[in-house]
Amino acid sequence: MAASLLPSIFVPLVGLVFPAVAMASLFLYIEKEQVS
């Protein structure tokens, strides 16, 4: 049961969290480059 339930939680988590972290890190990198 847990094996079939895990992808339904893991896939949206990766699909939402990973792009958010990538966009945040890219935004901070651009801001840091503009300031300096």
Curated annotation (Swiss-Prot):
What InterPro entries has UniProt attached to this entry?
PSI_PsaI, PSI_PsaI_sf
Indicate yes or no for the key word Oxidoreductase.
no
Q: How does it sit in the membrane?
A: Single-pass membrane protein
Any single Gene Ontology cellular-component annotation: photosystem I
From which domain of life does this come? Answer: Eukaryota
Q: Name one Pfam family in it.
A: PSI_8
| Intrachain disulfide bonds | none
Q: What is its main location?
A: plastid
Record carries keyword Plastid: yes
Key words of the record = Chloroplast, Membrane, Photosynthesis, Photosystem I, Plastid, Thylakoid, Transmembrane, Transmembrane helix
Transmembrane spans: 9-29
Q: Which GO terms describe its biological process?
A: photosynthesis
Q: Where is the protein situated, by its record's location annotation? A: Plastid, Chloroplast thylakoid membrane
What is this protein's function? May help in the organization of the PsaL subunit.
Family to which the UniProt record says this protein belongs: Belongs to the PsaI family.
Q: What is this protein called?
A: Photosystem I reaction center subunit VIII
The species this protein was found in:
Ostreococcus tauri
Where is the organism placed in the taxonomic lineage, from the top?
Eukaryota, Viridiplantae, Chlorophyta, Mamiellophyceae, Mamiellales
The encoding gene is: psaI
